């Protein structure tokens, strides 16, 4: 199910104790469209708030989300650093999630093995102030109330490979096709959904975008709730999910 709405408001309307897993990647607040590494921007969202306001918005959303989660539910947040690592947004998120009462499960490093054209070196060949591009992102995993989950449908091989907190796979390569500037690849929600949920579980993505989490949910036999601000993204996400076949 795709809901076209402002997630900061709509999460308050979700049923209490109804969500088993959250898999999401909120806007990174890196000024997409004016960012020299990404000239594409969101259709309906200005990705350039003052950092304090941005963090307060996210904190408010996850505070409102807490009563909507079942006990033991996991919350997985994919986020990148800003300014070549000088602004550690992931650290701020960990801090406010702990303040809200979420339990830390793990922090996974997603090695994308991708760096933009390195034409800006800072102080080239000098220790003064070199630039440190970050070809990786974080996947922060939290839990509500307790750390135990018993029902899963992942294989032994998947568990062995994915329980190492360093994941290496390529970023999404079809963003131009879909017209969205910041999609994650199906591999990211696939691993999180299989690690932290089971068939029939209800998965929420409050920043649904092109519905990639929903596509994987349908393939894997999970229920899906996606919230997205932009109407065109909602329509394309709906079409993607409808066209997706269930994996037996």
Regions found by a protein language model. Give the residues of each.
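Positively charged, low-complexity nucleic-acid-binding target-recognition regions
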Residues: 243-248
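Core catalytic lobe of class I
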Residues: 1-236, 242
């Amino acid at each position: 199910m795709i809901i076209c709405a402002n997630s900061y408001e709509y999460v308050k309307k979700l049923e209490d104790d109804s969500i088993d897993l959250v898999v999401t990647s909120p806007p990174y607040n890196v000024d997409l469209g004016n960012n020299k590494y990404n000239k594409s921007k969101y259709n309906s969202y200005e990705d350039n708030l003052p950092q304090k306001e941005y963090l307060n918005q996210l904190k408010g959303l996850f505070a409102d989300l807490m009563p909507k989660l079942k006990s033991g539910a996991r919350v997985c947040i994919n986020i990148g650093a800003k300014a070549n690592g000088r602004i550690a947004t992931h650290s701020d998120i960990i801090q406010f999630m702990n303040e809200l009462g979420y339990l830390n499960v793990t922090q996974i490093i997603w090695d994308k093995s991708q760096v933009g054209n390195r034409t800006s070196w800072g102080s080239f060949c000098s220790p003064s102030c070199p630039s440190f591009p970050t070809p990786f992102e974080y996947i922060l995993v939290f839990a509500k109330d307790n750390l135990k989950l018993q029902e899963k449908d992942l294989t032994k091989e998947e568990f062995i490979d994915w329980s190492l907190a360093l994941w290496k796979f390529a970023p999404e390569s079809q963003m131009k096709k879909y017209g969205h500037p910041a999609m994650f690849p199906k591999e990211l929600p696939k691993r999180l959904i299989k690690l932290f949920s089971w068939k029939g579980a209800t998965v929420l993505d409050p920043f649904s975008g092109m519905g990639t989490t929903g596509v994987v949910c349908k393939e894997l036999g999970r229920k899906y709730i996606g919230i997205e601000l932009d109407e065109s993204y909602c329509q394309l996400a709906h079409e993607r999910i409808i066209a997706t076949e269930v994996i037996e």
